[in-house]
């Protein structure tokens, strides 16, 4: 898949391997905690589950396979691409 900067983590499908490309720099309200949690560019991830009614995303990421829940509103700041052929 070609790098497409319109792909946001909030719209990424479940159980597909992906890579964080960067952040939506047009929006200056991006929470610093996204970076502090370790969701850095080139980090590999997979969305394991999304809670019902557009709830938080449960994400596994990094070499240590860390897991966090991330609000959809925060996931909209993260630009991603698929690493699956």
What is the role of each PLM region?
Residues 29-33:
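Short alpha-helix capping/helix-loop boundary micro-motifs
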Residues 24-26, 49-55:
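Short, charged beta-turn/beta-strand-edge "cap" motif at the junction between a beta-strand
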Residues 58-85:
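C-terminal structural segments of small proteins and small subunits
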Residues 4-11, 66-71:
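PDZ/PDZ-like peptide-tail recognition elements
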Residues 11, 22, 47-49:
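A residue-level detector for short acidic-glycine micro-motifs
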């Amino acid at each position: 898949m070609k790098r497409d900067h319109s792909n946001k983590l909030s719209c990424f499908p479940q159980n597909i391997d992906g890579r964080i490309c960067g952040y939506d720099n047009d929006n200056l309200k991006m929470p610093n905690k996204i970076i502090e949690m370790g969701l850095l560019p080139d980090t590999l991830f997979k969305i394991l589950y999304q809670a019902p009614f557009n709830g938080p995303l449960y994400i596994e990421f990094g070499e240590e396979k860390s897991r966090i829940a991330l609000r959809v509103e925060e996931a909209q700041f993260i630009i991603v691409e698929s690493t699956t052929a």
